[in-house]
Swiss-Prot record:
Membrane topology: Multi-pass membrane protein
Tissues in which the protein is found: Expressed in cotyledons, roots, hypocotyls, leaf veins, root vascular tissues and root tips. Expressed near the root apical meristem, in the cortex region of the root elongation zone, in lateral roots and emerging lateral roots. Not detected in extreme root apical meristem or root cap.
UniProt entry keywords in alphabetical sequence: Chloroplast, Membrane, Plastid, Transit peptide, Transmembrane, Transmembrane helix
Protein name per the record: Protein root UVB sensitive 1, chloroplastic
Top-level taxon in the UniProt lineage: Eukaryota
Length: 608
């Protein structure tokens, strides 16, 4: 019997027989597809198993799969033979018709049985591997289900997995171009564009939390300032003779004289730059008041055209001084906003914000100026409204600023609270309590809601205000020391310090050595706070300077406490965000030099 015979017309005839009725040679050449499919549940389970491990089993050879199917068919066929024979000897009862093939059949059957067992165990291993891989893919799928964002500054882009290319792709690429032109997307793109041009890169993580509120208020005040500027410029032009047939050369000379005299104020005011570092909020508010006063004077020039140069020069001086103070204090604010030391970025975006507000203000100012015309009364009324808005927004913007440096008032408030409660206060708590000018008590304009908050102790606030008034940095040695014993006692006590502290006529006099640093001034202020605490809480009143320098004296006790606790106070303050690199102060220029001339100084007639 040839193979071609079995694979052609008679294959269906042979395949229709029972497996026990087919000879061993026919079994070898009978195609796997022509076998009668069993109906047992074991075969169904086998099919499901094959489907589950398809990726593993597909790598096996065709011969292995054919043998496996033959084994299952033989096994199930034998079972059918047993069922058909009833009480007979099973499938082998009828299969013994061909005695010449019995021995070869038994050997092949044994081989098929062993091969089937091998394939069975292979199936079990493949199934276990497939289950493990499926569980692993499930766990990976859970991880993929977690949202992944690509962040660039304030712009976020959601990434989704592409399982075909095995990579992450932007979610935006899944949408059509038409879907990106929706009003929501256009609004988002405009917002991203404004953020890119007007806010520092990495916002809000690249700046401090008070930056946005300050910028918003500053934008409104910038608009109001430009409106006032347009109205003032219009008044100046009317005063100089615009539209009244004035000689252009005379008008130009008056204008140049006005600006030239005004520039002198900026040069003279530059020597007081250290004042602006100590109280930048108060000086900035003063600069805004000065600027508005200058605008008001310029608007009065049409009423008094004969005093144009005088009034214009005074107004120009005020505007120049205000511009200098604004530029100086703006640097202090920008340095505080740059939480990642991105000073140039913050300054550049601040200038961009200023240009936007100025452009809007100029447009609104032109509209208001056209509505007012030449009426001075209407111009003054509009100026009053705009100035009120300008000053209110300025005040709100400065209240938003959280200064992290330590000037004498803030340092005294921090140290006093530390001595009372054992903890350094938060930055916001101290800035909310600090008045714009500590020496001017009414300058601390707090809202009624904030007046109800008593976060800091009243003792600490009273101590900070009192120390601010009584402190004198850079005192003269000749004004404090009156005899040789006091000088020797102070020099010996503060031998290893960069300053000399004593109390004289109710004032805390700090004499700075030539090598003293801002850190030494901060250290001296910590000792001043402890001296004040000893005076108010321990009842230790000041005695003579010589007695206070002895062991057990006020100066000796306070200096010993400073040497033990100053570093702890610094660390506690730094932990809440304070910059403790040094004291921001304006000391007097006098310094003390100690060295080879010390004996000569102490033995001089002036010291006795």
């Amino acid at each position: 019997m040839s193979c071609s015979y079995l694979l052609s017309g008679d294959a269906s005839v042979v395949a229709s027989r029972r497996w026990s009725d087919v000879s061993s040679r026919q079994r070898l050449f009978l195609p796997r597809q022509s076998l009668r499919q069993p109906s047992g549940s074991s075969f169904s389970r086998c099919v499901r198993l094959v489907a589950n491990v398809n990726d593993h089993f597909s790598k096996q050879s065709l011969a292995t799969r054919n043998c496996l199917a033959s084994v299952f068919s033989a096994d199930l066929g034998g079972s059918n033979g047993n069922n058909d024979n009833g009480n007979g000897g099973g499938g082998g009862g009828d299969g013994g018709g061909d005695n010449s093939d019995d021995s070869s059949f038994d050997l092949r059957y044994l081989c098929f049985l062993l091969l089937g067992l091998s394939c069975f165990f292979h199936f079990r291993l493949s199934a276990a591997s497939a289950i493990a891989k499926d569980q692993n893919s499930d766990s990976n799928g859970d991880a993929v289900k977690e949202t992944v964002w690509e962040v660039r500054g304030s712009k976020r882009k959601r990434l989704v997995p592409d399982f075909v290319k095995d990579e992450f792709v932007s979610e935006e690429s899944a949408f059509e171009l038409s879907s990106s032109l929706t009003p929501e997307n256009l609004l988002a793109q405009c917002r991203n564009l404004l953020t890119q041009f007007l806010l520092p890169e990495g916002f809000p993580n690249s700046v401090t939390s008070d930056y946005l509120d300050y910028s918003l208020w500053r934008g409104v005040q910038g608009i109001a300032s430009q409106i006032s500027g347009v109205l003032a410029t219009q008044s100046l032009l009317y005063a100089v003779g615009l539209g009244k047939g004035a000689i252009p050369t005379a008008a130009a000379i008056n204008w140049v004289l006005k600006d030239g005299i005004g520039y002198l104020s900026k040069i003279m005011l530059s020597k007081y730059g250290r004042h602006f570092d100590v109280h930048p909020k108060g000086w900035r508010l003063f600069a805004d008041l000065l600027e508005n006063a200058a605008f008001g004077m310029e608007m009065l020039t049409p009423v008094f055209p004969q005093f144009f140069v005088m009034i214009g020069a005074a107004a120009g001086a005020g505007r120049s001084a205000a511009a200098l103070i604004q530029a100086a204090t703006r640097s202090c604010f920008n340095a505080g906003f740059a939480s990642q030391r991105n000073f140039a970025e913050v300054i550049a975006k601040g200038e961009a914000q200023g240009m936007v507000s100025k452009s809007v203000g100029i447009l609104l100012g032109i509209v208001v100026a056209n509505c007012i015309g030449t009426s001075t009364s209407l111009a003054l009324a509009a100026f009053g409204v705009v100035t009120t808005i300008h000053m209110y927004t300025n005040l709100k913007s400065y209240q938003c600023i959280q200064l992290r440096t330590l000037n004498p008032y803030r340092a005294s408030l921090v140290f006093s609270e530390y001595l009372i409660s054992g903890q350094a206060p938060l930055i916001k708590e101290v800035n909310d309590e600090e008045p714009l000018f500590p020496t001017v008590r009414f300058s601390n304009m707090k809202s009624p809601e904030k007046l109800q908050d008593f976060v800091l102790s009243s003792e600490a606030k009273a101590a900070a205000a009192d120390i601010e008034e009584r402190l004198q940095l850079g005192s003269k040695l000749s004004d404090v020391i009156h005899n040789k014993e006091e000088a020797i006692a102070l020099f010996d006590l503060y031998r290893n310090e960069g300053y000399i502290l004593t109390e004289h006529k109710g004032r805390f006099c700090v004499m700075l050595k030539e090598s003293s640093t801002p850190q030494d001034m901060l250290r001296s202020l910590f000792q001043v706070n402890y001296l004040y605490w000893l005076e108010k809480n321990a009842g230790i009143e000041p005695a003579s300077t010589y007695s206070d320098c002895k062991p057990g004296g006020r100066l000796h006790i306070s200096l010993d406490y400073v040497r033990r606790e100053f570093e702890h106070a610094k660390e506690d303050s730094e932990s809440v965000g304070w910059v403790t690199e040094g004291l921001i102060a304006r000391p007097l220029p006098t310094r003390i030099r100690l060295g080879h001339d010390r004996e000569l100084l102490l033995s001089s007639p002036n010291s006795s």
